[in-house]
UniProtKB/Swiss-Prot annotation:
NCBIfam families: hutH, PRK09367.1. This is Histidine ammonia-lyase. Belongs to the PAL/histidase family. It comes from Streptococcus sanguinis (strain SK36). The modification 2,3-didehydroalanine (Ser) is found at S145. Keywords: Cytoplasm, Histidine metabolism, Lyase. The lineage of its organism: Bacteria, Bacillati, Bacillota, Bacilli, Lactobacillales. The gene is hutH. One of its GO terms (biological process) is L-histidine catabolic process to glutamate and formamide. Its main location: cytoplasm. There is a cross-link at A144-G146 (5-imidazolinone (Ala-Gly)). One of its GO terms (cellular component) is cytoplasm. It catalyses: L-histidine = trans-urocanate + NH4(+). Contains an active site 4-methylidene-imidazol-5-one (MIO), which is formed autocatalytically by cyclization and dehydration of residues Ala-Ser-Gly.
Length: 513
């Protein structure tokens, strides 16, 4: 990919994060930003030379902030920080999450408030651009004082330590550098702290989940519209006049999306043609999906502020003042990421209920569990169970992490955000809900093929159905079928964005009005 993203600490977007994290876009540091980094570094060098007392530069860390460090030990202090703080647990974060983390950290550092050397920032950028991905365990951060443990793991390979992925192989940090043609570095005063003291890990994980949630919201409208086709849904609940008198942006956008998707459909009905009202899971799609759209639009705004923010401590102002504060505290993102998880969970919840309506013969008027010979075959019976399991798990995961705090560091850090847990939970809820929505689409397509009278599909539902059928076949449920294979195909189709792109060629879909 030839696209190069200019990093100035001010203009990074969520789409830029995705381009770097998932599509191999490279980055360069803005020329003015380089000057700001160098000016900030000069102030740190002056502090060390003048033996001034500044937290994390000439003192210990956390509750050890009153321990003075001699100028000759300031470099060792920083390496010790990385070695001792790299205490994460669990499985490694996905490579796209780590690349997002590296990018966001660089963008924060180039604002010029952290006192780091330009050469050190460029070293982290070199790892990113050349595809060296540090091995970062997923657990171990309190989300204050920043994401210390996981970010320490990010820094280890820069020193020739730790582990990293390169070209799909997990290697020692030094071996990864050697294969990529990168020289290791030694940290100078304040640099270890500048690299690890911030909300970067929780923001990186949450940024990817936010982007994926936006795509899922559009997919959920497609799924809901396909269910409407199956059930001969009543279209009046989506009329614009109904929603302009309650002008919630997400609700308005959802109603418009459904109208666009169903335009020209021969399957939809009007009130009293078959029944007076549809159930809430169809009739209230704008209100339910729309609420989640509004929540996620808010989270996106918070993410784009955070990826262009300084979350270091202490910070060094342009005038040379050193300020110890709390910008590393993850609470401003912990609450939004809890909110994100709840919003996504609701999409999974309502989609699972529509799956039940599709497979329930009393509700769909189709063969039980969408199979031609129910009894001999169980059809989609256990598929609905699986969706219910995922929806139920989401409800547990939706308990907010940000309401919890355990004091740490001898009670110096006595109130923490647990924001990284919130971000990780939101990402897991996203995976579960995406599976449920994929299953709804699969079940709706199966149901459409079983309908005795199936008329022309809508402007948006037809390309959705057509592309889906190119990848996932109608299931006869004979002895040759293993349904998990088709379920996996369905999930893979919507995860790679090809499915949504095909629908959006036909109709405009949005999350805000």
């Amino acid at each position: 990919m030839t696209h190069v993203i200019n990093l100035d600490g001010e203009h990074l977007t969520l789409e830029d994060v995705i381009a770097v994290a998932r599509h191999g876009a490279t980055c360069e540091i803005d020329q003015e930003a380089k000057k700001a980094v160098e000016a900030s570094r000069k102030i740190v060098d002056d502090i060390v030379r003048e033996k001034r007392v500044v937290y994390g530069v000439t003192t210990g860390f956390g509750s050890l902030c009153n321990v003075s460090i001699s100028p000759e030990d300031t470099t060792q202090l920083q390496e010790n920080l990385i070695r001792t703080h790299s205490s994460g647990y669990g499985d490694p974060l996905p490579e796209d999450a780590v690349r997002a983390i590296m990018l966001i950290r660089i963008n924060s550092l180039v604002k010029g408030y952290s006192g780091i050397r330009l050469s050190t920032v460029e070293k982290l950028l070199e790892l990113l651009n050349k595809g060296v991905v540090p091995y970062i365990p997923e657990k171990g951060s309190l989300g204050a004082s920043g994401d210390l443990a996981p970010l320490a793991h990010m820094v280890l390979p820069m020193l020739g330590l730790g582990r990293a992925y390169y070209q799909g192989q997990l290697l020692s940090g030094q071996e990864a550098l050697d294969k990529a043609g990168i020289e290791k570095i030694a940290l100078a005063a304040k640099e270890g702290l500048a690299l690890i003291n911030g909300t970067t890990v929780l923001t990186g994980i949450g940024a990817l989940a936010t982007y994926d949630a936006i795509q899922l919201l559009k997919l959920s409208d497609v799924a809901g519209a396909l269910s409407m086709e199956v059930h001969n849904g009543i279209t009046s609940p989506f009329e614009e006049d109904l929603h302009t008198i309650r002008p919630q942006s997400g609700q308005l956008a959802t109603a418009r999306n459904i109208r666009n998707l169903l335009e020209g459909s021969g399957n939809t009905t009007v009130a009293t043609q078959q029944r007076v009202q549809d159930p809430y899971t169809l009739r209230c799609i704008p209100q339910i999906h729309g609420a989640s759209k509004d929540s996620i639009a808010y989270v996106k705004t918070k993410v784009e502020i955070e990826i262009n923010s300084v979350t270091d401590n202490p910070i060094i102002t342009k005038e040379g003042h050193v300020i110890s504060g709390g910008n590393f505290h993850g609470e401003p993102m912990a609450q939004p990421f809890d909110f994100l998880g709840i919003a996504i969970s609701e999409i999974g919840n309502v989609s699972e209920r529509r799956v039940e309506r599709l497979v329930n013969s009393q509700l769909s008027k189709l063969p039980s569990f969408l199979v031609k010979h129910p009894g001999l075959n169980s059809g989609f019976m256990i598929t609905q169970y699986a969706c219910a399991s995922l929806a139920s798990e989401n409800k547990v995961l939706s308990h907010p992490a940000s309401v919890d705090s355990i004091p740490s560091c001898e009670n110096q850090e006595d109130f923490v955000s647990m924001g990284t847990t919130a971000a990780r939970k939101a990402a897991e809820i996203l995976k579960n809900s995406r599976r449920i929505v994929a299953t709804e689409i699969m079940a709706a397509c199966q149901a459409l093929d079983l309908k005795p009278e199936n008329h022309e599909l809508g402007k948006g539902t037809k390309p959705a159905y057509d592309l889906f059928r190119q990848h996932v076949r109608f299931i006869e449920f004979d002895k040759d079928i293993e349904i998990y294979e088709e379920l996996n195909k369905a999930s893979e189709l919507i995860e790679n964005e090809e499915f949504l792109a095909a629908v959006e060629k036909a109709v405009d879909l949005s999350i805000q009005f």
